[in-house]
Amino acid sequence: MDNFAEGDFTVADYALLEDCPHVDDCVFAAEFMSNDYVRVTQLYCDGVGVQYKDYIQSERNLEFDICSIWCSKPISVLQDYCDAIKINIFWPLLFQHQNSSVISRLHPCVDANNSRASEINLKKLQHLELMEDIVDLAKKVANDSFLIGGLLRIGCKIENKILAMEEALNWIKYAGDVTILTKLGSIDNCWPMLSIFFTEYKYHITKIVMEDCNLLEELKTQSCMDCIEEGELMKMKGNEEFSKERFDIAIIYYTRAIEYRPENYLLYGNRALCFLRTGQFRNALGDGKRATILKNTWPKGHYRYCDALSMLGEYDWALQANIKAQKLCKNDPEGIKDLIQQHVKLQKQIEDLQGRTANKDPIKAFYENRAYTPRSLSAPIFTTSLNFVEKERDFRKINHEMANGGNQNLKVADEALKVDDCDCHPEFSPPSSQPPKHKGKQKSRNNESEKFSSSSPLTLPADLKNILEKQFSKSSRAAHQDFANIMKMLRSLIQDGYMALLEQRCRSAAQAFTELLNGLDPQKIKQLNLAMINYVLVVYGLAISLLGIGQPEELSEAENQFKRIIEHYPSEGLDCLAYCGIGKVYLKKNRFLEALNHFEKARTLIYRLPGVLTWPTSNVIIEESQPQKIKMLLEKFVEECKFPPVPDAICCYQKCHGYSKIQIYITDPDFKGFIRISCCQYCKIEFHMNCWKKLKTTTFNDKIDKDFLQGICLTPDCEGVISKIIIFSSGGEVKCEFEHKVIKEKVPPRPILKQKCSSLEKLRLKEDKKLKRKIQKKEAKKLAQERMEEDLRESNPPKNEEQKETVDNVQRCQFLDDRILQCIKQYADKIKSGIQNTAMLLKELLSWKVLSTEDYTTCFSSRNFLNEAVDYVIRHLIQENNRVKTRIFLHVLSELKEVEPKLAAWIQKLNSFGLDATGTFFSRYGASLKLLDFSIMTFLWNEKYGHKLDSIEGKQLDYFSEPASLKEARCLIWLLEEHRDKFPALHSALDEFFDIMDSRCTVLRKQDSGEAPFSSTKVKNKSKKKKPKDSKPMLVGSGTTSVTSNNEIITSSEDHSNRNSDSAGPFAVPDHLRQDVEEFEALYDQHSNEYVVRNKKLWDMNPKQKCSTLYDYFSQFLEEHGPLDMSNKMFSAEYEFFPEETRQILEKAGGLKPFLLGCPRFVVIDNCIALKKVASRLKKKRKKKNIKTKVEEISKAGEYVRVKLQLNPAAREFKPDVKSKPVSDSSSAPAFENVKPKPVSANSPKPACEDVKAKPVSDNSSRQVSEDGQPKGVSSNSPKPGSEDANYKRVSCNSPKPVLEDVKPTYWAQSHLVTGYCTYLPFQRFDITQTPPAYINVLPGLPQYTSIYTPLASLSPEYQLPRSVPVVPSFVANDRADKNAAAYFEGHHLNAENVAGHQIASETQILEGSLGISVKSHCSTGDAHTVLSESNRNDEHCGNSNNKCEVIPESTSAVTNIPHVQMVAIQVSWNIIHQEVNTEPYNPFEERQGEISRIEKEHQVLQDQLQEVYENYEQIKLKGLEETRDLEEKLKRHLEENKISKTELDWFLQDLEREIKKWQQEKKEIQERLKSLKKKIKKVSNASEMYTQKNDGKEKEHELHLDQSLEISNTLTNEKMKIEEYIKKGKEDYEESHQRAVAAEVSVLENWKESEVYKLQIMESQAEAFLKKLGLISRDPAAYPDMESDIRSWELFLSNVTKEIEKAKSQFEEQIKAIKNGSRLSELSKVQISELSFPACNTVHPELLPESSGDDGQGLVTSASDVTGNHAALHRDPSVFSAGDSPGEAPSALLPGPPPGQPEATQLTGPKRAGQAALSERSPVADRKQPVPPGRAARSSQSPKKPFNSIIEHLSVVFPCYNSTELAGFIKKVRSKNKNSLSGLSIDEIVQRVTEHILDEQKKKKPNPGKDKRTYEPSSATPVTRSSQGSPSVVVAPSPKTKGQKAEDVPVRIALGASSCEICHEVFKSKNVRVLKCGHKYHKGCFKQWLKGQSACPACQGRDLLTEESPSGRGWPSQNQELPSCSSR
């Protein structure tokens, strides 16, 4: 790489400078991609399956032609074509992701959501290489006609939806590579690959052969010249940056170059080298693979690819790739040398790994040996450890050294990093619960590193420090290996720490950082080539972790760690973060003053931050290190500390030392509860529980709490008595409460003396208000009483219902938390009266699941259903108090149509609050919502709203932010609220939405008299006599601050709730404050400003005062809201509430705008009204903005050219694209405005993927799984990582949706965490030793002696894993394991549990072959913790019913016996299989090979289970002890209570005896009264029975009349509906008949026009023909002296005829237009066509014409038929033209001269009949008798046939003279005319267009007399050939439009064959046939019968020769008409 040239390297598409977004390779313009993938969509077309025989018959010829043409080309050309086809197949897989590409949906290695197209993980690479092997097979057999024909055949079958699995596998087998079959796996896995391969290859071969397409030229000409120039410019810049060793910037330029030239393989190879230098090995792997695909003979591309594999630790894989590269590049001698050297180096590395001992640890002797290592072999400085953005020169210098490490270390870095496994990026790491285990070489290679592979701290070394300090000497190579392993372990610990921090697992993070600090020595940190700041960042991470735990001890330790940073490491510049951390500690302790001091210090030290910091050895940015982020956080914390929340209590103990503060918060870390003591004088005294105990001990001698009741108040000056004691527990809940009611003596209040108003006008206004209030109250009471009486009369409920109503009234008085529900409850009566369609409302509520089916049925079952339904729904909503159901009820009401207008407007306004708040919610909490797992959301959405709304599958969060989708967005918020338990981080956001945003201040105007709300209760306040003024609005719910009174008192819902919760009873002003309050009220009444216009009427004042009041109001309004547009809704909303007088003032002024401009305070700017003082500021801002935009436009021009060498800290590359806002716990947390990403600076190179969007997954696609399968739980306190390019990446468990950024959504539930560094566990080769992970459903390699189909019954069982592992669905777009798939690796063996099931997408069949992997059922839960015996396992493999193991019959039939030697492969490495190793069973301990290891592993599993059971037992035991203690305490309590209750019972018994004596005396008196009352009751009952009998009779009569009236009304309504239906049907019939009549009249006129024009055209053609003959005769002027005059007369006649034709056409067109405009045909005058006669000419006689006139006559008929177009058909039978034995007869018939005595009509008879014979060719009888034409039969039987072949067949029927190649050429010409595409056209339309094109071509060609003569001249064999072949095809004129047909379509028909009689239409069965001269054949008997009445040929006569009646009723022509075809003259 020292000789660095342009062609040597270049870079591709992964821009990784800090925050450069990842570029997708599909940035390239869509127009450069060929439309190649249309053919694959045939796989999805709907159609009926084609029968195999029909398919073979139709396709065989075409495939044979294509195959023969393809194989006739040279082999070198074919191989080049195969390379081009390979690029086209892999283009959507590697270079360009298309949303609509079927390949990207079918192929498992394409992730449509993955925007990081540069990366390829190892699982995806395996699929790609398998696909490449399959594609390379076709190149090997490119000239083999047999295999190519088979390929084409299989491709056609797949396109026609015929399963060709067996043929495809056989083709691969015969192609010469059986090993591919072992890699393909089961059918579900391999079918997508095979289908893509065969269909793509078949398509491209067909395209090359049929269209003569040059794929090589298409690939070369993909890019335009401008793109090539730009790509070269970017490549040169990348070369320059590479030469300066600035690889990150070089990556950006190479990426830009690839955007312009994606087909250039050099760019990918060079970018791969840059990725290798920067440690991004997966990106280098992807670019190496792309380079080898584009140019498979380029050695450097293979070299980069093998390097990347070796860097990832895949040495065996790299070695195999190197061997393959040497074969491909054998013609390049220089490149082969590098590959050979690489081969040797890889072999040495493998040998070193295999030769090392397993008991030595590489970490132990590193530190001491480090000093003796030579400088040339020094280990690398990690380039990704700290990516600083330096602000000063010194820091820049340090960063340059750390980022590059010097030239001398670059090669060493490459060497050392080769042993580094795939943990280089934290997002690719295995699950922590699954330590990696390897087989064979993998095992020996990783036996040392297995100890450190897991991220779990339990698997790491116990004492890192001891390992590092232990000394022993090693060679330099071993020292490098040890160094790499040490750094691997350090990186793993650091990764565990910061990943746990990001996931809020603070204890795990603290454990990881603590272990790291214990192992690291700050004095020796430089020996690891780490800067001191890395150590300080680890200390900072530990402190942050302890802070997150939040317990008092951890908080103290965190404070010590922060102080340690400040004291011991002041030079590192992290003082700001340390002070901020100490402030957070104090903030956690609720010590706001101390926290404020530290936050202020941190704010002053922001400038000392060294720049944006990352966690050591990673690219994950520490969010707090970003200057903007830390500023924002500090401002938030300072604001919170300046205005701390109100404490829950204040300790009154003088010696209180609770964390140095007396304020008590429930959120205190050391909160243990408190006690609150209240006295009757409203004193409140509170103590910490500890302080209270101390106080009781020192002062009150441990007095019991209850004894303090009725004692003297503890406040010194208070004389009250303690009336209430409340004790709060440590959880903040009320633990116990003691209360004693103290009755206060009522003291008469002192009289209030108010100063009377001096203004008479104000006094009068007050009196008016009082009167109005009294009147309104009276009317409201009256109306309420009337309504209640009506309700009682209607419902007449029993007593229990009355009790329910009283309970409801009591509940109605209660205040609800939900303000929307409060509004609905308050106006329930209006809602009830305003809804007219109650049944519709209930149905909608049932469909929205607001009501359950039980509620719906109970509501319908009541008698007064219509009256009580709405009331029942509102009661139901109040009872449930569900915020979502309340909103849905409001939404349903807003969509009801039958609602009163006033109620509808109010409901719409209330409903619009939620829609308006939705946009604000998404803009404020968009970052948090992006983290959601949209797969879960899609499932919940479909479950809840699937039947009402469209699915959100495939949609992104940006879709919900659009204004058009606000309703769906609101439904998404409702869904989150209903499942809020699953989204804990969104609790505060959802509460803010429903409590504040959604339920804004609802202003309800005071109504007049009857409409006044009467449900609000009247609350009297003794001390406050002032009543609310009528002018103030009534506020129902206040989520945001609002003006509630004239003096702008701002209230909020929080204050209201706080007041309610703090107050112990109704508010009363204390006695000592009453005088002051009264004085204040009097002063307030005197000076109150009464200019609020809303909901009040202006008083009678002069107009100037009214106008000034309005001006004051609007100035105040504009000060609150700022400048507003005149068309703003706020003005119209305000105008609705204006009184009538105010509206009149505005109307007089001419509107609001002229009214406001009348005052100098207001100014209008760009139709925006603003205050004058604000206008000046706006103008200045606009000037600045204009200048700023100009500067930005100028700077954008040089954006690609100017790249400063100096790093810009403010550039977007060093900031994350997605800045997520921390979710605050409180609902009132401020929303930060700078959450959005900043714009790119002018000097920074523009990120190339800003416009790249993620691809939506198809509807049926399976869920995507993120690359590492690691969910990141996000809590409300965590600062969210926003860097898109950071090595850390958020992942989703199951996400079927596209995500715009790399930050993947996540579900809040935790799953198996994927950490560590060994995610590379794939099968590196497809041999017996390399096995896939358990989540890869691919068939592992089998030995050569084993068939690919292995029955499961023959497999020997394996041991059982401790738990069952679900299997991931196969070959979908997930290439990683998630929580539903896990791999367990133990010992040296891979054991996985997979599901064997049917061939469905969710289950795959895995045939383990020689691996012996046990196949367990996914449904079997009983197998999880049990070990099966050998027989049971065999039963499982043989298809046990419990485990549902099923084997495919096809797969089991192939092989019956499997050698048992397969089991050896489990325990013996591949390399030593052929060595002399004892593999026999070890008797007597095992009967079979491997049982000892199985028993050991089962024993280990049982040990683990026993440990778990023991731990569970200990926990249960502890819980049981606690429960027994509690129960014993309860038992003691109950015994004491029982004693007390016994004594009380004795007292009650004594009282009872006394009372019984009294009751006996009273009983005697009562019995006497009862006797008298019974007599009265008898009299009353008799009277009541009499009255009830009368009432029953009347009720029966009443019901009878009701039933009769209902029946009568029903019959009337039915009759009415029938009559209306008849009327409607009659109108429709009338319209239809009218349209048909118009169409009929138009068709009549068109027929008339055609007939008349046809006559004139015949005359014209005859005249033209005559002129031609005259021209021939005129050569002899002596013979014909009058020739010139004759020619002039004929030319004049010809011009008259043409004029007459145009005139006739115009007249008919005018009449057609008139009919279409409404006229009738009978009203129009008949078109007059002048009669034209041939000019008198005696010069030429028909007999003198030459013999060739027969041919001209034939041409005349042809031209005549061509003129008529589609209205007549050309019958080319020779009999029509009379070209039989006498060629001289045709001119006399077809070209008559003008005989003197014969009229014109008789002259035209011959030509008309000749043309009409073709029109009336078929009769219904003939249709019934003749067979179906072959063209149509073919179409009906082969409907799903290939469209191209069916088109060729149709055309060959119409034009039999052309072969398929010529017809294909015509199709190609038609396609070029149609913009080079026939998509969107049906087969009939294509046939029509091609037919028209062929006819146009024939018209253009001039007729050749010789050719015509040769074609139509009869020969001796003509009758025989004609009779054998049948009649030629005829183009029939289209009938009027019918269903499914177009008028312009030209259906192609086959004329009747010559094998049937023209009269009886029966097939000739005997030789009794008569053949006329015209060529028509008849039965002799039929023809004799015909000649009895006629003398002409039946087939050659006029138009009405064959009618629709039976043959007996035909209208035959008269005898005097002539037969020009048969008769002789």
Swiss-Prot record:
The keyword Ribonucleoprotein does not apply. It catalyses: S-ubiquitinyl-[E2 ubiquitin-conjugating enzyme]-L-cysteine + [acceptor protein]-L-lysine = [E2 ubiquitin-conjugating enzyme]-L-cysteine + N(6)-ubiquitinyl-[acceptor protein]-L-lysine. Gene3D superfamilies: Death Domain, Fas (1.10.533.10), Tetratricopeptide repeat domain (1.25.40.10), Zinc/RING finger domain, C3HC4 (zinc finger) (3.30.40.10). Residues 1019-1029 have a biased composition (Basic residues). Pathway: Protein modification; protein ubiquitination. The keyword Repeat applies. CDD domains: RING-H2_TTC3. SMART domains: RING, TPR. TPR repeats lie at residues 231-264, 266-298, 536-572, 576-609. Residues 793-805, 1894-1912 have a biased composition (Basic and acidic residues). Phosphorylation on Ser-378 by Akt is required for ubiquitin ligase activity. Its EC number is 2.3.2.27. Changing K1289M: In a breast cancer sample; somatic mutation. Disulfide bonds: none annotated. It is found in: Nucleus; Cytoplasm; Golgi apparatus. GO terms for molecular function: ubiquitin-protein transferase activity; zinc ion binding. A zinc finger (RING-type) spans 1957-1997. Interacts (when phosphorylated on Ser-378) with AKT1, AKT2 and AKT3 (when phosphorylated). Interacts with CIT. Interacts with POLG. Interacts with HSP70. Interacts with SMURF2. This is E3 ubiquitin-protein ligase TTC3. It comes from Homo sapiens.
